[in-house]
Amino acid sequence: MVLEVKNLSFKYSQKLILDKLSFSVPKNSITSILAPNGSGKTTLLKCLLGLLKPLEETEIKACNKDILPLKPYEKAKLIAYIPQVEYYAFNFSVLDFVLMGKATHLNLFAMPKAKHIKEATSVLERLDLESLKDQGINDLSGGQRQMVLLARSLLQRTPLLLLDEPTSALDLKNQALFFDAIKDEMKKRELSVLVNIHDPNLVARHSTHVVMLKDKKLFLQASTPIAMTSHNLSALYDTPLEAIWHDDKLVVYAL
């Protein structure tokens, strides 16, 4: 397993948000987190990254390393993260922003070399972003920024990638391009993905495994075909839903 989580609990003040979650992310997989709104999906990702501190009984291992005591630069060698669309304090050019993905591969204060710039440019070309490389990151649309964040994460070359609602600002074309780029990368090297998505249809289309959360706890973890059924989805969302599989594609609608 690339990621193993045991007894993850988290409180805001005295309010319990996550209660003893235990789940894992297999190698070379895309595991989606699916849950009703307000279930702590983003909080979970921030706990995994160390941006929020879970309760003491929590155990989190990435690539068999206990990541809670690791320093930020050590975590950055294991985990890349794409948050929901953000505005940045400094308006870096797209190329410079993507090159930050190489920071953990360079010595302190070292400048990127020609080979790093070539690699960054190649990733931008793959994502149809080369024409934007000289623009400021804050001058882009939300969807364009998400694609640039993906480029930076791919350049980081970590074994684990965490995504928080990565397609919320993307049109249908770029949603497909986004996940196609990740799947292409998975064919080249070992890469596992944990992604927070709210759309069950996207989960079914792109995920190999699903983690469902409900009432602060783990509701279900299973492979996608087993997890994404009418029974499970109706129970998860407390509303009657029909899930129909056809040619390995899922359509979910309310009854």
Curated annotation (Swiss-Prot):
One of its GO terms (biological process) is iron ion transport. Its main location: membrane. CDD domains: ABC_Iron-Siderophores_B12_Hemin. InterPro entries: AAA+_ATPase (IPR003593), ABC_transporter-like_ATP-bd (IPR003439), ABC_transporter-like_CS (IPR017871), Metal_Ion_Import_ABC (IPR050153), P-loop_NTPase (IPR027417). GO terms for cellular component: plasma membrane. It is found in: Cell inner membrane. SUPFAM superfamilies: P-loop containing nucleoside triphosphate hydrolases. Pfam families: ABC_tran. The keyword Transport applies. GO terms for molecular function: ATP binding; ATP hydrolysis activity. Keywords: ATP-binding, Cell inner membrane, Cell membrane, Ion transport, Iron, Iron transport, Membrane, Nucleotide-binding, Transport. Residues 3-240 form the ABC transporter domain. It comes from the Bacteria. It is a peripheral membrane protein. Part of a binding-protein-dependent transport system for an iron chelatin. Probably responsible for energy coupling to the transport system (Potential). Belongs to the ABC transporter superfamily. This is Probable iron chelatin transport ATP-binding protein jhp_0821.
